[in-house]
């Protein structure tokens, strides 16, 4: 495909032929194995130069059929609970398996011990409740910290250091807990903090300084320190030198193994959502197009965050002559992807391609309004596409009840 749009989210489409594009069903997710590999190579370089270990946070990307593409580059997986931990164990059994959850369930913890080798607790009370069993099972035990250092602007929903946050343990909470349970420090092998969201290494440096100021006295006794996720390492222009300095200085100063657990960095710009225009209409001065994809169902972060995803050959409002608002077919009035400008009006049946659609899409989509789940396809480095999985009516129905025998 000859692309006039050379932005990073669409770089992998150069090997996709128009014939292959036309053969894809819509809507569909298309995973880009070449870009996954390029991201993996960059992250492997960081590990080789610093000695850190980088995990895949499956909450952002858990399409296990392409785990073999990433396997040569990652140290293991990070899970948010039992199912993700099991998935990592099943699909990457030789890799490390880390898990963090805001609160573990007593009826699941024994099974979790079968999969995870590193278990991070959110609070001293959870550490006291489950830590002894984890240690007895030979697991490496950690505690998530809240360094009370906010570096985000405009995304409070993603800020674990916001006032009143339920995520992580503050120094005051830790000190009070140790007074009550003096045995807690002996349970810990490592510490964990996760405070970033799509940020550069300067935010990490600020956060790391706050961690040292509040918890530095604990670090010499630790085996590892997990810097969490939110590091946009594979984004063009990311400050790799600053990241690597943070890693190497921390490991040298405290003698710990540093872990990172990004999700987006592994699959950044490594996926597309192909969609078709179903209808066009005019409401006053607003031109609209109804697509066969739904922001609410297929790209929920567009509404939750919110953000406006990149669209192939489209521009910002005012950049090109025709401004069109793109929306989905559901009954939700706010099921809108955003306003885009085009060189010419859109027409019914026209195909559009959204970029950077591998992350927080297939793992978060839903069937509101009975919307079908889009099939998931993969494209290799030669531009050859293959179907990984498709969904139908039974997938919609089975989530809502049990069919009669």
Predicted feature locations:
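N-terminal capping/small domains of soluble enzymes
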Residues: 2-104, 108, 294, 342-355, ...
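A short small-residue
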Residues: 18-24, 190-194, 228
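Active-site-proximal beta-alpha core segment in soluble small-molecule metabolic enzymes
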Residues: 49-224, 246-249
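Feature marks short, surface-exposed loop/turn motifs that line or immediately flank catalytic pockets
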Residues: 149-151, 197, 233, 266, ...
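Glycine-rich beta-strand-to-loop/alpha-helix junction loops that act as flexible
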Residues: 194-196, 225-234, 262-265
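Charged helix-capping and loop-helix junction motifs
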Residues: 205-210, 239-245, 275, 341
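Charged (often Lys/Glu-rich) extended helix/loop segments that serve as interaction or gating elements
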Residues: 246, 257-405
